[in-house]
Amino acid sequence: MTKLLYRLTYALFLASVYCVAQTTEKSVYDYNAAFGHGFYTNNGTETRSASGKPGHAYWQNSADYFIQVSLDDQSKKITGTETITYVNNSPDELDFLWIQLDQNLFKKDSRGNAIIPLNGSRNGAKGQEFDGGFNIGNVSLNYTTLGKKTKKKSKSKSLSVSPNYEITDTRMKIKLSKPLASNGGEIKINIDFSFTSPDYGSDRMGVLETKNGRIFNMAQWYPRMCVYDDILGWNTLPYLGAGEFYLEYGTFDIHINVPKDHLVVCSGGLLNPEEVYTAKQLNNLKQAAKSDETVIIRGANEVNSQDSRPQAKERLTWKFRIENARDVAWSSSSAFIFDAARINLPSGKKAMAMSVYPVESNSRDAWARSTEYTKASIEHYSEKWSEYPYPAAINVAGNQGGMEYPGIVFCSWKSKNESLWGVTDHEFGHIWFPMIVGSNERLHAWMDEGFNTFINSLSTDAFNGGEYKERQRNMHRFSSFLVNDKMEPVATPPDNLKERNLGILAYYKPSAGLTMLREHILGKERFDEAFTEYINRWSYKHPTPNDFFRTMENVS
């Protein structure tokens, strides 16, 4: 989520620190509260070991998606059909399935709209009057019961049904006439859907008007499986705007049909470049794949040129695939400048850093450096923690402050210099938390925002010889504020935090704690070994806070 939120709350934080630092309060330190034997509320289990590793019987369900979608750039309407292949690897038969319908946040009668304060919020649609939310059409199921896993699967029988379902706010419950088998039961869920995009979609998606056309940044745009796990069973907390996401991993095949004058970028790799790019653009992309410097794929002077788009059809379908992902987002516009460079990964593999942005953002102190920032960020985290897994890392200018998705991020078209570096680096840091290490953001915001803010501090120190290196802070001055008992605990779910406190409690305070642990308690070597082991253990899995704490204690 946006680093702008962190910066704004940090400014308030400094003001508060100035006030509280004038007096020295008596320490409230209590050894028994901090280190008592009751810290861990349960012992290790078959699915999660006491040492912080996934247990010998750890299981996780999966969800693959095939989605065909079209964009009407005049009405801002998205129309699609999807097939979700859901595999139940749990030891439980499932009598029903839960689906997330995040666009329903923008219905007039949604729970999220009901709790937006009268003085405004970054959540919701900022008062836009429109017909928001999903329209759900046909829903059907095809499922195959495989039963318990064996070395050789027996022949399975497929059954097609039209299920009963009910929609409550941002959730959809599909009732199964026949339970989905445990330990490998598979079902295909087919859903037709459409929605009208908000202009401002809770600072996570939306539509930006530019002089050369609209930029459509599409996220939370398709019905998505809820997670069924060994902690809570079905995770069905509603989407209210502040709490982010918890999703299953899988493979996504996405076909996006748009007007031919649009360029499209999406999570993953493009499968049909010859059908959607000109010969010149294909050649420029080949050059970029070999270049450590930014190469222009489509320049500012080509944005309105018919020669910069294929001429054969009125509409084009762009086909993308991403594997080992928990989500997918995309962007489409006729207004894009497009540039790229290669990313060098520790294994010797290559990926592509790409940026798309309007002419309004095209200057050397702004988005002309976006690909440079993207490349540096991905290369740093890949070298320091674990290798970037996707074929491209794409930065898109939009009307979002900053928002992250697998392989693609949306950042403010107004950002420049240090601000653009900061938001770009922050959003791409989220590839590691929570895109690779898939924690439950809706419950534990600090496990992605706090961890990410921490690794951002190291990448910023390293970038370009310290070009934007932050000054060292006096933690003694901050201590009174960090233990302010008028603020909620860090572990409070984000939907239950005061909005003004989210930046401190989810971002800064956990980051400060990790920095102190690394710099002053464990030391860099011991901390880095344990933190890297946590990433390796829980890549593409669903860790809880206890899994993190146990790993850090056992490894360090």
Roles of regions detected by a PLM:
Residues 26-27, 68, 77, 87, ...:
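A surface-exposed beta-strand-loop module
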Residues 21, 30-43, 48, 320, ...:
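Hydrophobic alpha-helical and helix-loop surface patches within well-folded domains
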Residues 220-234, 240-425, 454:
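Hydrophobic helix-coil surface modules that form long, contiguous segments used
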Residues 109-127, 194-252, 273:
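Glycine/proline-rich low-complexity spacer/linker segments in large multi-domain proteins
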Residues 76-105, 109-112:
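Ligand-binding face of N-terminal immunoglobulin V-set domains in extracellular IgSF glycoproteins
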Residues 1-25:
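Bacterial Sec-dependent N-terminal signal peptides
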Residues 21-79:
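N-terminal, polar/Ser/Thr-rich
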Residues 82-84, 88, 101-103, 185-199, ...:
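Short, hydrophobic/aromatic-enriched beta-strand segments in well-ordered soluble domains
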